[in-house]
A protein has these predicted regions:
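Short connector loops at helix/strand junctions that flank enzyme active sites
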Residues: 8, 36, 113-117
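NUDIX/MutT-family hydrolases
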Residues: 113-162
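Active-site-adjacent beta-strand/loop module that shapes the phosphate/pyrophosphate-binding cleft
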Residues: 77-129
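C-terminal alpha-helix
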Residues: 163-170
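Functional cleft and adjacent loop/helix regions within the main domain
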Residues: 33, 37, 136-137, 153, ...
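Acidic, metal-coordinating catalytic segment for phosphate/diphosphate chemistry
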Residues: 1-14
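Conserved Nudix-box catalytic region and its N-terminal flanking loop in Nudix hydrolases
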Residues: 17-65, 69-82
Length: 170
C-alpha cells in the first residue's frame, strides 16, 4: 500500500470586489471561524495558479477561466455569471511559512513541520453567485476589507486582507 502525503505548499485566495469588500466563508468544522479560500496542491507539479483556480471552484463555485476559450464542465458551474476571467486572478507574490499544527502533521511526510502558503487575490462582481462546499463551509458574508480582517481567526489571512488596497487589480 502506497501512502499519499499532503503537500506542504498551499494557496490563500482573497476574493474581493472593486470596492474592497471581501468574501468570508465560515468553516464547517469550526463554526464561528471565518477564512478565505485556502488549499494545498494536489500533486507536486501542480502550478500554484492551478491550485488557486481549483480551490476557488471547489469552495465557492466561482469558475476562473479564460473566457475566450470554451468553458469546461465544473460541478458548480451554472450560468456564465458564475465565471470570472483568468486576468482577475492575481498572484500577489507574497508567501507565509507557518508551523503545521501537531494534530495535522500525520497528513504530511515524516519530518515535515511547516507549510508555505502563497497569496492570490481574485476580483469578482459583488453579485456573483456563491455555492459553498457544504462539507467545508457553512455560510458566507461580504464585509469591507478592514472589518473582514478583524473577523478572521488566522493572522496570515488578516494580514493579507489588510494588503488588499496595495495589490487589488484596478
Amino acid at each position: 500500500m502506497t501512502v499519499s502525503y499532503k503537500i506542504p505548499e498551499s494557496v490563500l485566495v482573497v476574493i474581493h470586489t472593486a470596492n474592497l469588500d471581501v468574501l468570508l466563508i465560515e468553516r464547517a468544522d469550526k463554526p464561528g471561524f471565518w477564512q478565505s479560500v485556502t488549499g494545498s496542491k494536489d500533486v507536486a507539479d501542480e502550478l500554484l495558479l492551478e491550485t488557486a483556480i481549483r480551490e476557488v471552484g471547489e469552495e465557492t463555485g466561482i469558475v476562473v477561466q479564460n473566457l475566450s476559450t470554451p468553458a469546461t464542465s465544473s460541478p458548480h458551474q451554472g450560468a456564465l455569471s458564475s465565471s470570472v476571467p483568468l486576468e482577475n486572478l492575481q498572484d500577489w507574490q507574497l508567501s507565509n511559512v507557518y508551523d503545521i499544527y501537531p494534530v495535522w502533521r500525520h497528513r504530511y511526510a515524516p519530518g515535515v513541520t511547516q507549510n508555505t502558503e502563497h497569496v492570490f487575490g481574485l476580483l469578482v462582481p459583488r453579485d456573483i453567485p456563491i455555492v459553498l462546499a457544504p462539507r467545508e463551509h457553512l455560510n458566507f458574508v461580504w464585509l469591507p476589507h478592514r472589518e473582514a480582517a478583524d473577523k478572521y481567526f488566522s493572522q496570515s489571512i488578516a494580514e493579507a486582507i489588510l494588503q488588499l488596497p496595495r495589490y487589488r487589480k484596478l
